[in-house]
């Protein structure tokens, strides 16, 4: 009885919120499946109308978004289903081909594949063993056999080290035999201008011959003036010690001009120096100190050239001196 009285006493306070939410309920019931106006919820009666409107808007938007998500996922699922159907069709065709093959044919195919793989691995092991034999560590004390990857890495390091050593050796050889040789032999002895005999040495044929055989040596340490003075002193000593009545012509007139003289000044200076009336050329060849010159101009000609090139007037004199 007390509960019934409380319900009756509390009933007059409820119509006010019901009257407030009546338009909203009628609007919501028009789009829903429930058409009765007596169906009500206790939640709208407890909440203000503004909050309930926001909740309804949020629920409507949430209802729209899941539809979109479902639509996108539906497209993805359709594409994935297409690809899976293609792969399944290919697998089924392969299975059909294998099913069409008999059991002996399948066994033969498996044996062929296994033999091919076995041969490939056998060749690889032989190649790796050959590589291990030529590695430097193979000739040392007995060590554990390296794996394939370790052997390949070690071989790579050795190849890089040997390449660097070879490049360094080439550079050193080019500096030793290339740079200095090119500095002392300009244009590979093609345009060399060996110094002609000095004017003081052209007074006597023997001095001219000595000057032609031994041109002025330009020592890399001595200055050019000292080298010229030393050459003049050597020519004077030879002229004082030579026979005064010698009828032999000068070696400069005997030897033909060098064929490697390509520059006009050097080619013109060679015949003038050989005749005994020319002036000395200034640009001489820088020889190595204490070492013979490798070019053919500084080499002593063989004796048969002297005999064949001698004049006809000097031969009777030689025979008379011999008698």
Swiss-Prot record:
Region (Disordered), start-end ranges: 1-107
Classification via InterPro entries: bHLH_dom, bHLH_transcription_factors, HLH_DNA-bd_sf, Olig2_bHLH
Show the CDD domains listed in the entry: bHLH_TS_OLIG2
List compositional bias (Low complexity) regions by residue number: 76-93
> Which Pfam families does this UniProt record tie to the protein?
HLH (PF00010)
Q: Which UniProt keywords apply?
A: Chromosomal rearrangement, Cytoplasm, Developmental protein, DNA-binding, Nucleus, Proto-oncogene, Transcription, Transcription regulation
Q: Where in the cell is it found?
A: Nucleus; Cytoplasm
Major subcellular location class: nucleus
Report the domain remarks.
The bHLH is essential for interaction with NKX2-2.
Associated pathology:
A chromosomal aberration involving OLIG2 may be a cause of a form of T-cell acute lymphoblastic leukemia (T-ALL). Translocation t(14;21)(q11.2;q22) with TCRA.
Function comment: Required for oligodendrocyte and motor neuron specification in the spinal cord, as well as for the development of somatic motor neurons in the hindbrain. Functions together with ZNF488 to promote oligodendrocyte differentiation. Cooperates with OLIG1 to establish the pMN domain of the embryonic neural tube. Antagonist of V2 interneuron and of NKX2-2-induced V3 interneuron development.
Indicate what this protein is called per its UniProt record: Oligodendrocyte transcription factor 2
């Amino acid at each position: 009885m007390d509960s019934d009285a409380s319900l009756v006493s509390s009933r007059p306070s409820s119509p006010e919120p019901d009257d407030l939410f009546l338009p909203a309920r009628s609007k919501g019931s028009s789009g829903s499946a429930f058409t009765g106006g007596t169906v009500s919820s206790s939640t709208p009666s407890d909440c203000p109308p503004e909050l309930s409107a926001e909740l309804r808007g949020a629920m409507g938007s949430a209802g729209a978004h899941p539809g979109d998500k479902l639509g996108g996922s539906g497209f993805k699922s359709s594409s994935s289903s297409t690809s899976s159907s293609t792969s399944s069709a290919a697998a089924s065709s392969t299975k059909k081909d294998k099913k069409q093959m008999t059991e002996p044919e399948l066994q033969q195919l498996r044996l062929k594949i296994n033999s091919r793989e076995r041969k490939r691995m056998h060749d690889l092991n032989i190649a790796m063993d050959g590589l291990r034999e030529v590695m430097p560590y193979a000739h040392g004390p007995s060590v554990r056999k390296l794996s394939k990857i370790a052997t390949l890495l070690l071989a790579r390091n050795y190849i890089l080290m040997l390449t660097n050593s070879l490049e360094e050796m080439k550079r050193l050889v080019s500096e030793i035999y290339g740079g200095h040789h090119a500095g002392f032999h300009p244009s590979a002895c093609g345009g060399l201008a060996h110094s002609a005999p000095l004017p003081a040495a052209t007074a006597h044929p023997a001095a001219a011959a000595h000057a032609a055989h031994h041109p002025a040596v330009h020592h890399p340490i001595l200055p050019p003036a000292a080298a010229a003075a030393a050459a003049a002193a050597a020519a004077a000593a030879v002229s004082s010690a030579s026979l005064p009545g010698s009828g032999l012509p000068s070696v400069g007139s005997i030897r033909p001009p060098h064929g490697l003289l390509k520059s006009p000044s050097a080619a013109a200076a060679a015949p003038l120096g050989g005749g005994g009336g020319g002036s000395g050329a200034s640009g001489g060849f820088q020889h190595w100190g204490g070492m013979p010159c490798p070019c053919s101009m500084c080499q002593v000609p063989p004796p048969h050239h002297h005999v064949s090139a001698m004049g006809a007037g000097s031969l009777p004199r030689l025979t008379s001196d011999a008698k």
